[in-house]
């Protein structure tokens, strides 16, 4: 299922060569701040002593998705990338400008809607261009780490591309609590990699600008399971899963029928029954109380943590096995 024509005998990134048994930190200069400070994207390359697959681990494509950044940073600090076979390319923080501005986008542009990018386009487009130009030709598959946005908390989950057998296989190996197929989005990183026949799975866990220890640990454990499966690292006892991933076949958003103050009565990731009360919406004077009920038997995939809502706002993302 996975190609045996491995690419890690010698990788060339930014005119630097990384041979078998070598590890390097390569910095791609992106732009300067108005103060003249140079902004560089640090890329860590860990090439094992033996031929094997090359995997890209990418965090911070959206600058405010701190869990994605923290879990890759923590793996660096804990020296989890002791690679024996194959190569791991790690980008803990791609969207540095968004990170500095505490925002999802880069100068108003969504990097994940800017692929394949342009050498002379917007800053987001240029970042996408250099990522595709410098890295993708070296990669066999990738894990793209994200969190929920807009104060929506995603229960740890893996998303893969429909009808992509290799993506589905990777999702099963990762073994997050929840998994499901998700349609490709035009100009996204996953879509562009799909065009280049590179499978990408997306890990979602927690919400933007908030560290979530459970989401971080699930992301680390799933990543180690993938590395172990391909014999890139030695066995590590603590990566054994305590759960089997639940495969969801249908998903939908439960939206607010009225405006008001919202309170959830179920926890994220919990099993739910059709007709079960998931939360309540009251007006600011306590005169009305609208019960939010589940339309399906299934699980809570994501939960809105913002208390002030308007009609039509998403409250829960729910899925059916």
Enumerate the language-model features and the residues they cover.
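Structured catalytic-domain cores with a bias toward divalent-metal coordination
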Residues: 1-321
């Amino acid at each position: 299922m996975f190609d045996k024509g491995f690419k890690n005998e010698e990788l060339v990134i930014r005119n630097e060569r990384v041979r078998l048994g070598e590890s390097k930190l390569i910095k791609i200069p992106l732009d300067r701040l108005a103060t003249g400070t140079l902004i560089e994207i640090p890329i860590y390359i860990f090439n094992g002593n033996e031929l094997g697959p090359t995997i890209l681990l990418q965090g911070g494509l959206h600058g405010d998705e701190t869990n994605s950044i923290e879990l890759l940073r923590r793996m660096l600090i804990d020296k989890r990338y002791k690679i024996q076979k194959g190569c791991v390319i790690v980008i803990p923080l791609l969207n540095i400008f968004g990170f500095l501005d505490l925002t999802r986008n880069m100068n108003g542009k969504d990097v994940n809607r800017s692929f394949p990018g342009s050498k002379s386009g917007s800053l987001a487009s240029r970042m996408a261009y250099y990522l595709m130009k410098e890295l993708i030709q070296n990669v066999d598959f990738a894990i793209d780490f994200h969190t929920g946005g807009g104060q929506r908390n995603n229960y740890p989950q893996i998303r893969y591309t429909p009808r992509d057998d290799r993506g589905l296989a990777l999702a099963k190996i990762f073994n997050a609590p929840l998994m499901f197929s998700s349609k490709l989005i035009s100009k996204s990183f996953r879509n562009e990699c799909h065009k280049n026949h590179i499978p990408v799975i997306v890990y979602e866990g927690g919400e933007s600008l908030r560290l979530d220890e459970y989401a971080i640990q699930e992301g680390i454990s799933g990543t180690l399971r993938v590395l172990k499966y391909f014999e890139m690292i030695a066995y590590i006892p603590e990566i054994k899963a305590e759960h089997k991933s639940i495969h969801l076949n249908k998903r939908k958003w439960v939206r607010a029928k009225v405006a008001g103050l919202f309170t959830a009565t179920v926890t994220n990731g919990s099993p739910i029954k059709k007709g079960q009360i998931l939360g309540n919406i009251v007006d600011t004077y306590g005169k009305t109380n609208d019960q939010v009920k589940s339309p399906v038997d299934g699980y809570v995939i994501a939960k809105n943590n913002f208390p002030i809502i308007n009609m039509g706002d998403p409250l829960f993302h729910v899925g059916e096995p």
